[in-house]
Amino acid sequence: MANLIVIMGDSGAGKTYSIKSLDPAQVSIISCKKNRLPFAGNYTVRKVVDTVDQNGQPVFAYDQIKMLLRSSQKKIFVIDDSTFLLKNEQQRNIGLKIKNDKVNGFMQYEVLSFHFKDLIDFILDELPEDIFVILMHHITKDETGKVKTEVVGKVLDSLIEKSCDVVLLAEVENGEHYFLTESCSYATTKSPEGMFPPRIANSLKTVIEGYKKYYGME
């Protein structure tokens, strides 16, 4: 069972920038949208998009991610930005509906739910326990104004938060970037009691080290 951590936040809040604290030799960055990082360094970014192989058969982003997670020797993986896995597949399904009218609205969300949940289950059930997978994810607000992970449709509501023990919110205030770590009325953030202070530096290194120390993994 791998260790799944979610970093959620708006664009520009510092989700991706927090990678800079990690040693490039120890982290594998899987990008669902961007080709480059917002900082210099010898980091390798593997972009995944739906494509076709040389025989014209579809090769989906989800399958590429699983292959990278399974085959790499790295222990830390960042999937940035996992929101686009949902949005890109939604656009593909809309295209299918336009072409053949076989993908109705509810079925579209059922498919989205299945593929995203299947990826989370793969991370939690099939990867070794010394692996860390960090999902960088955009945010939205529910009907009460509470900040939560952005999903497509209602089928996936709260799935991400329910699937892991650590959900942090990236925020910026007066030019300072930081993570909120504890459950509150403002957002669906959470972490085990005593793992982190309520507010910590915008640093994946700090997050992973705190996690390891809490569970005696060092």
Question: What is each of the regions a protein language model found here?
Answer:
Residues 1-72, 76-79, 83-88:
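Conserved P-loop
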Residues 20-21, 125, 162:
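Solvent-exposed polar/charged
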Residues 27-29, 133, 167-169:
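Short, well-ordered beta-strand core segments
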Residues 34, 50-53, 138, 172, ...:
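Residues that form or immediately flank small-molecule/cofactor binding pockets and catalytic motifs
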Residues 41-47, 65-72, 112-118, 167-173, ...:
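Low-complexity, flexible helical/coil segments
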Residues 72, 129, 162:
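Structured loop/turn residues at beta-strand edges in well-structured enzyme cores
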Residues 81-159:
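P-loop NTPase motor core
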Residues 142-218:
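Conserved GTP-binding G-domain of TRAFAC-class P-loop NTPases and closely related GTPase folds
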